[in-house]
Curated annotation (Swiss-Prot):
Keywords: Cytoplasm, Mitochondrion, Phosphoprotein. It comes from Ovis aries (Sheep). The modification Phosphotyrosine is found at residue 60. GO terms for cellular component: cytoplasm; cytosol; mitochondrial matrix. This is 14-3-3 protein gamma. It is found in: Cytoplasm, Cytosol; Mitochondrion matrix. Pfam families: 14-3-3. Belongs to the 14-3-3 family. Gene3D superfamilies: 14-3-3 domain. GO terms for molecular function: insulin-like growth factor receptor binding; phosphorylation-dependent protein binding; protein sequestering activity.
Amino acid sequence: AAAMKNVTELNEPLSNEERNLLSVAYKNVVGARRSSWRVISSIEQKTSFYLKMKGDYYRYLAEVATGEKRATVVESSEKAYSEAHEISKEHMQPTHPIRLGLALNYSVFYYEITAFDDAIAELDTLNEDSYKDSTLIMQLLRDNLTLWTSDQQDDDGG
């Protein structure tokens, strides 16, 4: 490819053979890079997918763990989801199924594990009217989450 580049810089018309050689040389150079890029892209997708799974399984553990163990698995889940999110933002289109699935599961984590628990812990500090409004909203959130997760399971064939 370097030799053919030098030939083109002479500003002389290329023969058919030279044009074909130039085309083949650059096709081979670009083809090797495209192949390398596909491998890297595949690795990034797999990494994001497995980190998402890791976050999911820690989230499942957080649903049943208590005390110090719960805090540890919540932190591990957050870390895995966060790493997967950073990789997917950098290497995947916003519409990529892995990236979208990650967004859904990460939002479930925030709802089920962090936000909902935080809200429940504060319910006893509310006055009666606020308590009713807050519990209604929390129930609507839980209903939406149930709907979203059942839709995702249907789409996954499960």
